[in-house]
Amino acid sequence: MDVVLAGADSLWVLRRARSDAALGLARGVPAPAKTRAAELAAIADVLPDGFRPLGSKTPLDLTYFSRRQRPFLAAVHAVTHLSPVLEDTYLLVTGAGENGVRLFVEGPALTLSHMAERLRVAVGHGSLTRTAAFFRLMGLASELCGTYARDPSNPASGDCAWKVDVLCGSEELRRSLSLASGVRGVAEARRVASLVVGGSASPTESLLAMAMSLPVELGGVPLPAFLHNEELAWPKGARQLVNHQTMTPDFYWPRHAVALEYDGAVHEDRKNVREDHRRQQDYAACDIALVTSQADDLRSAHALERLMRIVALRLAPCEEPGFMLLVEQALQDSSASSMRTTLLSQLLPLRPEGREDKKRAPAGDKSLHS
């Protein structure tokens, strides 16, 4: 029996498969054209530990490929996929199937499209603003193209899984969405994918990438393009001066010789303080200006704008004379500042007092992914 999960249930298992070493995701395995997913007891046996109980009050989201296949069960919320099934439309969950049952989840493009549709409905009901919905979808796209995964059961305040395999690059996501058809939410998913920066290692990095790359009307600051989590090429002759053979700045502008790194709670113990000192020495030895940021720089739009101004000042010597004027106009734009406030609220909501993730990377609003 083949089981193809849909919607929120698919996203739950997708996240668990990314973060659980016992599970995996296989690409290039075509989803079945026919499914017989009506045996709930058998389905429950292959769902990962921690998945919610199945029942009529909490129906399981399942995909079927014809209207005839849809079961009339109170415990199943059936989604019909009638458009062509392309490669990587669905991913096989390895390590979960047993007794002849294969478990599939939606791939990144379909996941993003279905979330876009859910958020559109929420906006229509008045439970969410259009701006908040946009940034929530941006956050999910960044996660899908990044190396972190939010807690599937508690994405709002649960800990993230770090250093997980990338599901897809931003270009791959855009390509997959361009080929998708007949899927609700795909238009908004394409819009978001056209703006997302791939490669973020935490929600905090995703937020900073958005702040430094989005158009001004969406809350961004007009900074030059950056490299994101790419290995630094040491200047010629620098290897005898540095402590590290390689380094990977969070954000780096090679032409400007400027790097930006986020120092979260993980950097506060003595061992990591020494490591940070060595990294700062390496940057200085190579004449690279390092800007560091911490949680306080993301407490408010004003704090974020202060950080963006510092970064811009480091970049300014290699830019045109009017560069800082454009930056200041963006930073002082009240509409753009309001956008940045919403960005912060959706990607880094307030945590319980005294609680901070290992990398200061709290998850987004629970309703974003539940």
Please give the residue ranges for each predicted region.
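Short gly/ser-rich loop at a beta-strand->alpha-helix junction or flexible surface loop bordering the NTP-binding
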Residues: 1-185, 322-323, 330-370
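Surface segments flanking catalytic/ligand-binding clefts of nucleic-acid enzymes
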Residues: 162-370
